[in-house]
Amino acid sequence: MTAEPLEDPEASSSSTHDLPEASSDNTADENSADLPGESEGPDSLPDDVPPGDIDEVLAEHDVDQTSEAKAITTEQNEEQDFIRTDTFMRQDEDLLSKQISTITEKNVDQAYMQINTVFEQDKDQASIQTATLMGQDEDQAFLQIVTSVGQNKDQASIQTATLMGQDEDQASLQIATSVGQNKDQPSMQMDTSIGQDVEPAISTDTATSAVKDESPDIPHQGQDNPEETTSLLPQDPGILQVFVGFQNPVWDRLAENNRTSRSRTVSPSDSQTQEKTLGNPNVPEGQPVLVPNADVLSNLPEHVQTSVGAADPPPSDTSGRDPEPTPTTNSAKQEAEGFKALNPGSKARSPGLTSEDSAADSGIPPDPPDPGSPGGSPPHSPDFYQVALGRNLLDPNLYRPDVENDYMRSMTSLLGCGEGSISSLTDILVWSDTATRMGVAVGILASGCSSPADRLQDEGPRLRTVASLLRSARSAFSSGVMSGTGSALHSVTHLLESVERRTMEGIRSAMRYLAHHLTSRWARTGPSGN
């Protein structure tokens, strides 16, 4: 705006420069014409000019020269002033343009730097936010994957432990049940066979003791009062029933072999009984024979002999009376047959009971043993003497098998008792329960093992089957768990790959968007900066 008005002074100055040159030429011509030396003298004045007017002409000529000199001086001064003014104005314009260009460049640089700083900050913030979001997504995905994998592993381990525990519990229960059944069946069968073998001897002893229990003063007590004898029998028919257990041909053959071996053995007591029966031809076969007191005393133990001597009734009471055991024995047989008819499922027991058997059936404990007697034997009373007379001592040889072993030796010592006969079948049953289990002992005899350790170490077919089933089930379960774990890891790997791929795609798209956005803004701000 300041440059346009300055052009007119330059044009005027140029015109003025041109004008003084022309004017100077004119003035020079005039001066040269007016100079006195060069000008014409008075003689050269025109002829028509009067002499009086010469002074006036000279004066005018001087005035013209003076005015011209003044005009020249004025023009020179004006030209110098204009040149100075033009120089100053040009200097001011250059300085102003330089300052304006410097300020403009500074402003452009500052604006460009600010724009670049904002763009870089936006880029950094966007990249940081993108990286943060991607890191959060990756962390969340990894945590979720780890949590799901841990839960799957925990559930699989819990299910594995539960199934294994159930399998082990079921196997242990089955093994324990089978072992218990295998042990209980031989014990019940052995108890039954022992009871069947011992019961005839007990019935014979009780029948004989019933004959001997009769007092000499009352010869026909069994015939006159049969109800008193039957009152000693147990009223509950289920007491005498014996559980035969599960039938097994192996145990039946063992029982038959035992009975055969017993029947082959002949004891001294049997030979003495046969000789006494032959010596008394009037006594019918199958009935007990009364042994004289001397013979009985010779066969009884020492403490029984002393008690017999002390409790022997006087001979005056028994000299005129003969005992009649035959009617009493016949009545006892009739009562036994009647009891069998009433209880066909049970084995008949002899109606004649000893004092110990009646005490055992009624639940009354027997008399305590006398501490003064040797071996803890019961007190010597007439009842004990009569029971001793009525019982036949059991010979251990009858129960001795063909082949000796530890189990049968212990049974022989139990049956023999070292001093006298067994008291009842309860002793055998209690021994079979409290000892090392009758089933194990019979199993040892049947299998031919030398000791229980051999039988325990020998693994039966049922145990082997259960073990093989457990092994196969465990292998199948482990293979299933491994395959399930492999598939789970495979799916987790695929999930991680997909998450990583999506993350990289998101990063690329974000970078493309930022690059496109920033380049467009730079393209818009470029022309304005220039």
Curated annotation (Swiss-Prot):
Q: Which InterPro entries match?
A: DUF4678
Query: Mainly localized where?
Result: cytoplasm
Keywords, comma-separated and alphabetical:
Cytoplasm, Phosphoprotein
Q: Kindly list the GO CC terms recorded for this protein.
A: cytoplasm
Task: List residues modified as Phosphoserine.
Answer: S468
**Where is there biased composition of kind Polar residues?**
11-26, 222-233, 257-280
Q: Which residues cross the membrane?
A: none
Q: Where in the cell is it found?
A: Cytoplasm
- Name the segments for region: Disordered: 1-85, 207-233, 256-290, 305-384
Give the Pro residues compositional bias ranges.
365-381
The keyword Transmembrane helix is annotated on this UniProt entry: no
Reading the lineage from the top rank, the first entry is: Eukaryota
Bias (Acidic residues) occurs at 1-10
Name this polypeptide is given = Testis-expressed protein 44
Q: Which organism is it from?
A: Mus musculus (Mouse)
Gene this chain is encoded by: Tex44
